[in-house]
Each structure stands twice: as structure tokens, then as C-alpha cells.
A protein has these predicted regions:
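Intrinsically disordered, low-complexity linker/loop segments enriched in Gly/Pro
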Residues: 221-314
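N-terminal, Lys/Arg-enriched amphipathic/low-complexity engagement segments
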Residues: 140-189
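Central antiparallel beta-sheet cores of small beta-barrel/beta-sandwich binding domains
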Residues: 28-126
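Short, structured beta-strand/loop micro-motifs enriched in basic residues and often containing a Trp
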Residues: 149-158, 190-197, 297-305
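Bacterial N-terminal signal peptides
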Residues: 8-21
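Short, Lys/Arg- and Gly-enriched loop/turn segments at beta-strand edges
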Residues: 180-191, 219-229, 328-338, 427-430
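Conserved mixed alpha/beta catalytic, RNA-binding, or beta-rich assembly cores of soluble enzyme
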Residues: 279-308, 312-389
Length: 454
């Protein structure tokens, strides 16, 4: 009996110890899972909110420390908590409005509800369902070069158009564009006119709130003729000149002599028999897609997304910075010009097809307010609006923001730099929006200390 009793005690001890050990292990596993879940919350998230049936995208930065959340939602500072897989935070904007989030984390996705409260209408908050995924990481490896032959061309800068090619930051794309009338390098009309575009190109990791960088490494002619006209657009006419130009608007064909680098009229009038202009191939259109909530603008239009900017310094060697407002950026290029004077005064420049190569990159978490261009000698900020006055203001504000961001200048310092170094160009008068570009020679900025990449 004593031996049996001792054996029973021993067995009981072993079984009981195993149960305790198993329960303890399960508890530790649960704690580890919770810690793992919490750790996965820290980072940059892309929020897709269903706002009355329309997807709106936001960036959200979260940092978790000991159950507390910090960061920002769409740039608004947030504070909150995380308990297990449950998240709650409140973000506040400068006007006193709030975004309150209640959500759960599961399988790498945050989903729940965001309540938007406008400080001016606090009695009527709006609650919307959302999902969020961690922002994709840049692909590791050697950048790729893509040969893309377009078969479809689009006449809207739309987020709904299916991407024709997916590329990664650092990749290069070689392609072609048709002219503004839809005619290709062989003289074949491929699509209805109105600046049909090549693209859109989906750029991996580019998310709303980022900046897309497009470096034009090749902008070359691929045929020997271009079309223009003999009119002057209404913005360039006073009453007397309008009367004199009443018979204008006829199509004019130009010969493009790449061997000598000039364009000449194929059928010149008497006084223009020996007239020629230097060839300077450019792209009239470079654009990212506006957000899905916005009406898709036609490819003859322009705005903060870029578009039909018709700026004659968007040439080989230029770098264009554009805001990203939809996942993948959705980059469009087109509307090649063999040459163009400031403003595109005829309404049509020397319209032609083009051989184009570009390299893309992404600046994460930083979105430019409007199109910017950089050359070897200048930085250039664009303003595009319904009047030249408003475009002038937009260009000035765009450049002021650039100087503040890149060089940490104060507003008075910005004024001193602009007042002594600004160069203004009227870039566009032919379309709905006028364009004004503020340029600064980089030599004037050499003594300033750069604080950021752009």
C-alpha cells in the first residue's frame, strides 16, 4: 500500500505539473500573439474608406508603445490605445475637427469605422467603414528596363483606366506616344484626337500622400513632320488683333529636319520662305490620375495632377514631380511637341508622335502641392488655374512651399529669396487653365543648406 500510494502521488504530481505547464504555455502563447499583433500595427498604412460608396484614400502612421498608439491620420496627430487586436484612437486637425477610429487588426489588415467630425458642424458627424493595409515596401533588386508598345490610348486621366504595365521604383520604361490628333509615327490614326495618352503605368509602392518622380531620359522625334495652325488663342488677342486674325485657324504642316535640328514650313508663304525654328522635343502631357472621388478630367485639361501642362521645358533630361492621389499613381504621358513657344499661343504646337523613355521613383509620405520640374540648372514650380493671375499665385505658393521644405526657410526668408531670384514664364494660355511657372536658378541656392531630398 505505501508503494502504491507513493506511485499515485508521483503520477498526480506529473499530470498536475503538465496541466499547469500547458496552461502556462497557452497563456504565454496568447501573450506572444498579442505582442506580435501589436508590433505589426506600427508602420505606414494606406486607408481605403468607403465614403458614401466612393473610395477615398488616406495615409496613416501608427506607433505602438506599451499599449498606447501615437502617429497621424492624414497628417492629423492621433493618440489612442491598442488592447489585443482592438484599436481606438482620435486624430485632431488644426481647426478642431476630429477623426475617431474604432477597429480591429486581423491577418495584417486593420478594419473598422472612422467617424469624421467637422469643427463647424459637430452635430452631424459622418461614420464610414474602412480597411487599411500596410504600405508596400520597395522591391529589392536590380531596376528593370521595360519595352512597352502601346495598343490602347486613353482620353481621360482616370483612376478607373486599367494599368497597361506595372513597374517598380527605379525601373525605366521605353515607349511611344501618338500625336494630339491620335496619329502614330507611321502616319496611321490609331485613336480619336484630343491628346490621347500612353499609359497608365502602375508604380509599385506609390500611394496617396506620396510624390511620383518621373525622369525623362529620352524624348526624341520618330517621324519627320508635325501639324500646327495659323491662329492665336483668345487669351492673346485684343480687339484689333482679333479682327486681323479672323481668317486664322487653318492647319499648317511642318517638316522636321533632325539632321540639322530645325523645323521648316512645308508650304511657306512668301515672307516665311526661309523661316526655321530649332527642334526641341517635349511632352505636353505628364500626369498622375486624380483620386477616384474626382471626375476624371479629359486629356486636354490640367491641374494639380499635372496633365496637359504644355510647358516647353518638359524635355529630355527634365525631372517632373507629381502628387500621388490613387494607389500606383497611374502615370500617363503624351502630346509630343517638336517645338513650342511659351504659352502654346497657336493652340497647337508642332504636334507630333514621340519616342519616349523615362525612369520612375517614389518619395514616400510627402506629396507636392502641384507639379514641379527640375532641370540641370533650375528648379521650377508650376501654377495652373483658370486665370493667369491665379496661376501666378499658385506658382508662387508652390515654390514658397518648396523652399520651406527643402531649405527650412522662414516666410520672410522665402520672400527675400523670391524677390531677388524669381523668373516667371507664362507656360500655357491655350486651354481652360492658364499656366505660369516660377523658376529659380540653382546657382542662387548654392549657399543654402538642403534639409530634404526635394
Amino acid at each position: 500500500m505505501p508503494k502504491v500510494s507513493s506511485l499515485f502521488v508521483l503520477l498526480f504530481f506529473l499530470v498536475f505539473s503538465g496541466i499547469v505547464s500547458a496552461n502556462g504555455s497557452q497563456a504565454l502563447d496568447a501573450q506572444d500573439a498579442a505582442r506580435t499583433s501589436n508590433a505589426s500595427v506600427s508602420g505606414r498604412w494606406i486607408v481605403n474608406a468607403d465614403v458614401f460608396g466612393t473610395p477615398l484614400f488616406y495615409q496613416m502612421h501608427l506607433k505602438e508603445e506599451a499599449g498606447k498608439l501615437m502617429g497621424d491620420f492624414a497628417g492629423d496627430k492621433l493618440e489612442g490605445t491598442i488592447t489585443g487586436n482592438s484599436i481606438h484612437f482620435v486624430a485632431k486637425d488644426e481647426q478642431g475637427g476630429t477623426e475617431e477610429c474604432t477597429a480591429t487588426v486581423k491577418d495584417g489588415t486593420v478594419s473598422g469605422t472612422i467617424v469624421f467630425t467637422d469643427a463647424g458642424d459637430a452635430a452631424h458627424p459622418n461614420a464610414h467603414k474602412f480597411t487599411a493595409t500596410i504600405a508596400p515596401q520597395r522591391r529589392v533588386g536590380v531596376p528593370q528596363r521595360h519595352e512597352f508598345t502601346p495598343t490602347t490610348f486613353y482620353r481621360q486621366f482616370s483612376a478607373a483606366n486599367k494599368p497597361v504595365l506595372t513597374v517598380s521604383p527605379g525601373d525605366t520604361v521605353h515607349t511611344t506616344t501618338v500625336d494630339a490628333g491620335g496619329t502614330d509615327e507611321k502616319g496611321l490614326t490609331r485613336v480619336l484626337g484630343g491628346n490621347p495618352e500612353t499609359g497608365p503605368f502602375y508604380v509599385e509602392t506609390a500611394m496617396p500622400g506620396d510624390t511620383l518622380v518621373v525622369q525623362l531620359t529620352r524624348v526624341r522625334l520618330n517621324r519627320d513632320w508635325a501639324m500646327s495652325d495659323d491662329a492665336i488663342v483668345p487669351r492673346g488677342l485684343d480687339t484689333d488683333l482679333a479682327v486681323k486674325m479672323k481668317d486664322g485657324g487653318k492647319s499648317v504642316r511642318w517638316h522636321l529636319d533632325t539632321a540639322h535640328g530645325v523645323a521648316t514650313l512645308e508650304k511657306p508663304s512668301e515672307h516665311l520662305a526661309h523661316y526655321s525654328v530649332p527642334l526641341r522635343p517635349m511632352l505636353g502631357c505628364v500626369a498622375t490620375a486624380p483620386p477616384p472621388a474626382a471626375s476624371a478630367p479629359g486629356t486636354g485639361d490640367s491641374g494639380g495632377f499635372g496633365g496637359n501642362m504644355d510647358f516647353n521645358e518638359v524635355v529630355e533630361g527634365a525631372t517632373i514631380y507629381l502628387p500621388v492621389r490613387t494607389p500606383g499613381a497611374l502615370l500617363y504621358v503624351g502630346d509630343g511637341h517638336a517645338a513650342q513657344g511659351d504659352g502654346e499661343l497657336n493652340g497647337n504646337a508642332l504636334e507630333t508622335s514621340m519616342d519616349v523613355e523615362f525612369t520612375v521613383d517614389v518619395i514616400p509620405g510627402k506629396r507636392v502641392p502641384g507639379p514641379r520640374v527640375e532641370s540641370a540648372t533650375h528648379i521650377m514650380a508650376m501654377g495652373l488655374d483658370g486665370s493667369i493671375d491665379d496661376a501666378f499665385r499658385n506658382a508662387t505658393a508652390n515654390m514658397a512651399a518648396w523652399l520651406e521644405e527643402k531649405y527650412a526657410l522662414t516666410p520672410p526668408e522665402v520672400a527675400e529669396v523670391l524677390g531677388t531670384s524669381a523668373e516667371y514664364k507664362v507656360s500655357e494660355v491655350a486651354d481652360r487653365n492658364a499656366g505660369v511657372v516660377l523658376k529659380i536658378n540653382k546657382e542662387h541656392l548654392q549657399t543654402l543648406t538642403s534639409k530634404s531630398a526635394m
